[in-house]
Swiss-Prot record:
Keywords: Meiosis. Has a role in meiosis. It comes from Schizosaccharomyces pombe (strain 972 / ATCC 24843) (Fission yeast). GO terms for cellular component: cytoplasm. One of its GO terms (biological process) is meiotic cell cycle. This is Meiotically up-regulated gene 129 protein. The lineage of its organism: Eukaryota, Fungi, Dikarya, Ascomycota, Taphrinomycotina.
Amino acid sequence: MLWRILTCCKSPEEDKDEHKKKPPNVGHAHLSVVSPLNELASEKSRSSLCIEWTIDSLRQFVQQLSVRQNMSKDRREALTYFINSYNDLFHDVYYGDGRSMSKTEEAQTIVTFTIGSYLYKYTHPSELFWQRLSDNMANIEDDGTCTEAQLAFRKRAALSKLGHPAFHFLPMNNKESFHYAWSLFTSTYFQKAATVSPSPNQQPVDSVANPQLRKASEITTISSRSDVDILLGKFKALIQESPDEHCNSWIQRIYITCVLPRNHYIYLLNEQVDFLTSIEIMKNQVTEGKLCLLNEDLGTLN
């Protein structure tokens, strides 16, 4: 099925090699299929980041966004309201203790995140995407680190249509992959590396006939305080159902992704070729170090 589509990209030889020499922690991003080459697994990437998390990252992104965009007064106030609401929702603030990731792990995160972005972009209507995400959550969280209660919580979050869609594809208990995807996504966004406009012949996923129905079902852009109020209501209901501290920290990470644009991608799939072929090309470019973002020091978001 689409949710495990990447497993189709492996050759029999790759499967044999993976069983023989599987690098530590490679199972964290279980959807991805980047070949676990020994030299990549052991080599630490210069782009790995260690940053204090959630509220600090959220403030940094919104600050840069306000500097670079000509925001309306209503949107500035809405984003400030969204930031301030974080402390009202979450009393035990989450901080990440970031660890350096191998290039293989980073490549896995990139491929997995790109798959999530691609599926959201081309699933119409978007309600179908979220339903499929919930129905197939067990195939995403299939590395054995997610309990049944945590899995059920993730399904409810998907059905609530909360946060950036692609971040739901990353394993809940692998904080490093989430940190890395956020850092890479926000850095490339401000570099204008992969922001695209919908095709003239393609209805944007975020478009529905009635804007009020969109607001009631899925907030894709925070533009007013009413947008924030809708999000807060959904998050409050979900937090009350949280089964443990792991879900508490995960939902905080999902919360901050609500500010991220959904028409931006850390990697663009080649839409002129077959879907599987496009993924294979991307996988090879990442593992061979041809993707320039893996060879640059992203620095901080300051």
